[in-house]
A protein has these predicted regions:
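Active-site-adjacent betaalpha module
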Residues: 1-10, 37-41, 48-49, 61, ...
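Active-site gating/metal-coordination segments in enzymes
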Residues: 4, 20-21
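N-terminal nucleotide-binding beta1-loop-alpha1 segment
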Residues: 11-16
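Acidic/histidine-rich helix-loop elements
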Residues: 21-33, 156-158
Length: 189
């Protein structure tokens, strides 16, 4: 198995924004602190091979959210900051496909394969991955280039960020996507 430039795989970087650096805001615990570094490695590969890149930016409609466009947390993290000519998709819901032209852009470019990395595993990454799979794209979800935060259960129990992350990945694997690592992708592109 290999992904070649000819296959035109797109890299979707989901919500790698400064607001996610505020761990306390999101629950107090985060897994995989190296996720952005792994995403940056993928981005460098895509840039060097001149393959399509889509930066997805969550623009919360909640004026109090640190991901609202008026807040500095809305900005992309420097490690994956878009360069001139790279497509930015702005969304205000969990899916990068809802209320955006992402599907149209992918289809117009005859892209059949998407590689997904970003934040957070159980929210926007999961929703976008599910929709990409439902739309028929060949989806690779990069486990070490995604991360999430701890959650409180409906009965008040605490779930660690790692448990939430692994459960989200398990729910997506082999149904909506192939869950793989950055190293796996490096070997096949």
């Amino acid at each position: 198995m290999s992904l070649k430039k000819l296959d035109n795989p797109a890299l979707l970087l989901i919500d790698i924004q400064k607001g996610f650096n505020d761990i306390a805001y999101w629950g107090g615990e985060r897994n995989n602190l190296a996720a952005e570094q792994s995403a940056a490695e993928l981005l460098e590969i895509w840039r060097n091979k001149k393959m399509p890149i889509f930066h997805v930016q969550h623009c919360s409609s909640n004026p109090n959210s640190i991901l609202n466009e008026t807040h500095p947390g809305n900005e992309f993290q420097d490690i994956v900051k878009p360069q001139e000519g790279e497509t930015i998709i702005r969304k205000n819901v969990n899916s990068a496909f809802i209320g955006t032209n992402l599907k149209e852009l992918l289809d117009d470019a005859k892209i059949k394969t998407v590689v997904i990395a970003g934040l957070t595993t159980d929210h926007c990454v999961s929703t976008t991955t599910r929709m990409a799979g439902n739309f028929g794209y060949n989806v690779y979800l990069i486990s070490d280039a995604t991360a999430t935060f701890n959650k409180k259960g409906i009965n008040g129990e605490e779930f660690s960020a790692e448990i939430i992350h692994q459960t989200a990945l398990a729910s997506l694997n082999e149904e909506f996507a192939q869950v793989v690592t950055t190293e796996f992708i490096k070997r096949i592109v």
